[in-house]
């Protein structure tokens, strides 16, 4: 898949408009378009993925600087630039010719017209601005991407590109010639990648076949990005401006137009030839469908920019129809889940972010663009931008093939398959494989192109590619038949064609399958086996082999599978072809996802990646590394693809996404041993087919036979096959489990590759497939094939794939498995996990056996998962696949995943119809799993996962399906799996995390290695997944295991049962975050699927999910503890969560959407620390595990949730703890969050009433702050205040961020419920975007868990309040904890009122939860710790101060009596500004919150203030200082105010009711929270200082006092909830701000230069991020790495900048959370200025809050990385938020004035 990361470049010349990321030139100009957007558009489905493959000598335009310097044209030079090791090969490798031969035959020339969004510069797009990207896959050249000058259409452009355009080689040269991308800012470490776009320049301009990828996705602003054609198309949406292919242009135009109309953002339409045109037509149709289905998924997510994804995706899906456009296609996939709910917002965001063509026309001069540079987190290869993970230039040629794959994916698939892709948001495979073939084929056969369905049927042979791409149609559940190519799986008839195509393709290049294969081959030009492209099948085999060799190219396998599938059955064939496509995608995507996300993992598991790739070769470490990189590169794109698929409607996603995921997973598995896999593919295909039939009742024996015979061997291949079949199966699933599988199955299928994800999704019973259903079958298979298997079981077509696949896979599998085993063994030995091998192998068999039965269950669970799950699953699946399935997850993760899945599956439906199919699939999966295990989860997988999890899995199998009864390891695994199942889905959605996954990969891997399998696995898996978790519609998926929960969750979310939902979200969030964070694969499994599904089990795992990384290091048996705890927690607190979840099930999806991308990073850090704290601090305390569910969940899920997690982590955890609490409260989830502190206590706490929990929480906070210092990956018992501060402070900033994110998430949750999470994703993205978004509710639940600590009674009260308040559409004012918990529920119900439910919650949680809930519980224990330790985390401090100050008495008051007030406090904390409802735009809530903010109490006060926000109608005039007085919403505010005031007053430091000063934030930010409108409200109140101090100072008192100067500062405050930006002129009362100096751990009063601006509040609409702040900022919070650095710097320095004021104003809004945590304030501060925000707080908080609140100021990425003075408002673009780097993606927010 070509991942076009179009990094928005602003104001660059048109020539800069296109930027080639990863060797593909992408319009750099799209100022609006974030790299992610482009990635979404192009990258996801189109060329985008290729975009950041290798950095050209010049930094890619995609780099952060990109926005400023828009070297739009990043070309993959024929000679690889510095970073283009692989690309060069791609172009030059002979293998490419073989691989590309067919492609060339097709004349695959993908032309992407990049219309830079020059909205700032000019709204209209000018031809001169448009640049065409020609992506040619030439047999000899490989993928050539060249950008034509904007002047002419493709021809002129091509000419411009150079005469070489016509020739691929020339094109390459030309490309080099063509604008070498100026170095965007090196900030994105991305090497500028040159893409030879001109491989077939001539073809493109001449032959209709040439695909015209018009990536016109820069509507606002750089409209004229690069491609005149695009511009012409764009401008004359209706007319056919492009001379090259007028018909195509027409199509394009129409597509664009429709996109614009639908999304108001025409991403880019891809039409090159009549075929394209036809395709475009179909695409347009699809686009509409996509849009309606949720085209607006978080496309950014897939790139790893959750926020971007969200914004870009919706639009992209809408706009990315023809092109897959991949903001729409790719992005859509990522944001699929959220897109549907958020279409409007997405559009807006895209219009802003992506600058859709329409929006460009009506673009504001002032807009904010977020540029994300995805650096694939290959630890070793920093060159590669994960974000651009389109193609990694690895020394291995994998990158190249990867690139080619993407090129084919993005290119061919983009246009021909684009439609499908678009439709099938699940573009992962489609785009990849299908793209090229499709392009060629599709282009050739216009009819096919016309309609996906039509093409599918019409160009049977050719359409196979298209069919693969056609997955898109699958994606569009509604239009499966139309999605010809992609639909193949869906359409039974089509499969025949695909089969024919497969056969033909095998023989002929033009065949779809062939094309797909070839594309893949193209992708891995240097792949060894690619050389034999003569036979498509052979070629595919070669490709597959090559992939296994080191290319991740699974084309070969795909082809075999494809053909097999086709032969077997039409649907099967289609699926197979899809699979082939997927295979293509998998190499790049899966590798990237698996690899990039677990760059470390891969690096660590060189064997893993290598094993996948290099396995064929000897376990050559070098190759392994290269492979690892390739995997990452591929995986990353894969993630994008996953994201895309997720974006599709659940049904579509289920079908397509599932298969795709499967394919990817397969590819990944295949990657383990391509050749073996090919063999395996054949045998496995047959096997799987048999299994499917068996599942269907047709081939039970055969399936079993195959599986059993090739248990080890078949595993990888079968996994692949099952993947392919999974898709088919998924298509067929509706037959068997239409309703269940349809919605859920597909997700599962998608998860298939992710297996964890799939399992999770299914389960539903993803794990169960492993353990539950098929006690005797291969659990490994179940897990790996879980998603796929379920699908397979359901889909006979999948079965049909069996025979051919079998043959192919048989030998392949043998080789692969043998090699993989060998390599895995080697790897393990390297890692010192030699024992893994035996366990791995034996476990695999075990798993395989267990998985089969489970698989059925999982299938059932899958089916059970509704569309929501499916949708979420798809998206998340993507992540999961790469994380979990990658499928290291399948193998090593498989155990955990299976485990999690197993329980889920059992829950879902042990008696699945697809037992046989599942068995077969399980077998395959087992093989794949094993392979993957070796590949990815070597350490965790093999040793712990395989062994422990397998045991657990077995146990689970035995255990009742409904019961998540996993052994310790198994339990958390099961949890993970279940969470994976439920959260994996979410994970998929969270693509930003994908990018972030890489970093997680690194860490978790290590951690995993250190600890037992269960622990390590859960940690590792969860960690990567955590980021993914967001995507994880785990909440949605929760139902699999706990269908009730799914239902409950949705209602809760929507109906006010936030508890469960939150928990789920939390879980999801956490899981996703973890996944992203660390071992995606591993983490995915760890991803507590159970948490969501089975609250009781999930809980512990939740903790693990959140804390897992920490846990891994912290305690070897943390996992076990987690496992045990989860059950206990499930029993106790979890049930609450379940209840909440049950209530919010409907909203689950939204919750998922809330996945935050931001949290990824922050959470990575935060999670790591908190988790470590849990693991380390909790290593001793088993409860830590238990608590983790509460704590970790919050932490992980929300990134804020870590409040509880943070509890141990003084700074971060301290502040997070409260958040966690709230989450806990939301889910009544066991309050175990305190678990952090309460190792021993934890368990009791979870079970015990709130008091115990509270005590625990308090203890945890105290312990964390006093006893523990969390260093990066672990909690250290002794904490250096400074180091801890530093690290923890980063955490605290993160926590603050998360808290804000939580708050945002909460609000977002509302949104989510309201919009299914699309906004959630964005909104949550505001702050905790990543965490929150994916699992805001979950987080809330987690938080509630913490709050649970406050007390069950409090929780109950909160629930009551929730119920009461829910109608109000405000987060309930119930006690903070309850509020948080309630909020999720309530917010969900009052979706309209997206008010800062979460925001408040976060704040409140931190402050109130920590103070009231946490401290109150253990005021005495917490008091020192809370007050002191919390000081570390300003927020905590705030909370704690109140708690401390207000003894239990007050705490109690607040807690029990003040549930409301807590809520208030919560709200206030975040919003500090008691915003009147959204309507209170003009009202200046007397900043009760601000007032409150003043004192540490401020957090309480702030929270109170927020309640007004919640109340919406209440606009306390009086300063919060009077706490009660200012509260127009007397009840909440008064209540909270009183307690808060009590708290505020009690605290000496807080005592100063600077609230009055702070109160200045009177302007009730009229958050149109409900509206979630992008409005900027000006608040005059000088609450800013208070919040900052609140955030900064443990005792916000000083801050408030500081905030005495009445100079007004204008701040952009973002209502995370509504995503509205308020421009608040807060009097900078105190010129000084209290900033927290992370280095010293002290709060410093820094004189802040307050901008004196109109005091009168003004409401300004901030279109860009306002709508989906999540899309931007939320994606990345301050990254742990950045935080420390930034914090110290920011801590003092940024404060002067608007940041301080911002912090303050955010304080009212988000600052209060920041107040809770110094970070929180700063977090909010980032709104105004990412850098300006109070550095310490702002760093962490800023990223979250900033991202989320990226309002007019677009605090840019709420990354407070470098402090950038955002306050200054010079015209022109400026980086508002400091570049945030989550380890994978560097994102910076640019504000264009």
UniProtKB/Swiss-Prot annotation:
One Pfam family from the record: DUF4585
Coiled-coil ranges (or none): none
Biased segments, Basic and acidic residues type: 227-237, 277-288, 829-839, 846-872, 1161-1174, 1231-1246
Residues modified to Omega-N-methylarginine: 1774
Keyword Phosphoprotein: yes
Modified residues (Phosphothreonine): 733
Top-rank taxon, per record: Eukaryota
Stretches the record annotates as Disordered: 156-189, 204-362, 407-505, 757-809, 829-917, 1090-1147, 1161-1187, 1229-1249, 1408-1465, 1482-1567
Tissue expression summary: Expressed in muscle, heart, kidney and liver but barely detectable in lung, pancreas and brain. In liver veins, expressed in hepatic vein, extrahepatic portal vein and intrahepatic portal vein.
Effect of residue 595 to R: Found in patients with obliterative portal venopathy; uncertain significance
PTM-bearing positions, type Phosphoserine: 1187
Record's keyword terms, sorted: Methylation, Phosphoprotein
Low complexity compositional bias, start-end: 248-258, 289-307, 434-450, 485-505, 1113-1123, 1513-1528
Biased composition (Pro residues): 1546-1555
Keyword Repeat found: no
Stretches with biased composition (Polar residues): 166-175, 238-247, 463-476
Biased amino acid composition, Gly residues: 317-342
PANTHER family in alphabetical order: CARDIAC-ENRICHED FHL2-INTERACTING PROTEIN-RELATED, CHROMOSOME 4 OPEN READING FRAME 54
Disease: Defects in C4orf54 may cause obliterative portal venopathy (OVP), a defect characterized by lesions of the intrahepatic branches of the portal vein that may lead to the occlusion or the obliteration of the small branches of the portal vein. Obliterative portal venopathy is currently thought to be responsible for many cases of portal hypertension in the absence of cirrhosis or obstruction of large portal or hepatic veins.
Protein name stated in the entry: Uncharacterized protein C4orf54
Species per Swiss-Prot/TrEMBL record: Homo sapiens
Gene name for this UniProt entry: C4orf54
